[in-house]
């Protein structure tokens, strides 16, 4: 298969065109143009305050929960501009799961954490819930570690286990997309490795967008990388190409550690 044919076959999940975002008078995202492709991992990198987390929170419109936010431009998700078209927010967030910087399990049992989303969206059948919980925990390689204590508190799990549980909770609603905002920044190296291995496995089923400060992590897990700086998308390219031959001097300076 030629490179050109492969590019044509790629399915765009998101197409961002000229998107701008303001917090009050502060112009936080400036004319962002970016495509995110199905069953790929897109890494969002850049120094603190560059707009990474703001950008990822626009993808499921969670950013609209922040006071005084104004958005303009196009954010096309599966062909619909969700900034302008009427969107069912509950349904949107069912299809776009999110995992945060630190594992944030609910103060409930392991089972109830994973079953929470399906219950909210109307699944009441006990057998069906059991099937969803088991599948979701297996998908994050946690089932064998917790199957004998599903009704104990999720807060009793280790940090790495809690983060995998939160990923399982996000997967339980059967989303298309998984957004991950620095999911390993609070974890030890062994737990980080498990999450990275999990990301590589999950991309066969899901489209993943991950914010990371870790250049090596971006290189290990992502197919394409987008470099943000001062609210601008400086460069977006195939990850191997970007790290070996960046087009913009600012990208080179950042990935080589001259600032950050």
Curated annotation (Swiss-Prot):
It is a peripheral membrane protein. Its EC number is 7.3.2.1. Pfam families: ABC_tran. ATP binds at residues 46-53. It comes from the Bacteria. Keywords: ATP-binding, Cell membrane, Membrane, Nucleotide-binding, Phosphate transport, Translocase, Transport. One of its GO terms (molecular function) is ATPase-coupled phosphate ion transmembrane transporter activity. GO terms for biological process: phosphate ion transmembrane transport. The complex is composed of two ATP-binding proteins (PstB), two transmembrane proteins (PstC and PstA) and a solute-binding protein (PstS). Belongs to the ABC transporter superfamily. Phosphate importer (TC 3.A.1.7) family. This is Phosphate import ATP-binding protein PstB 1. It comes from Bacillus subtilis (strain 168).
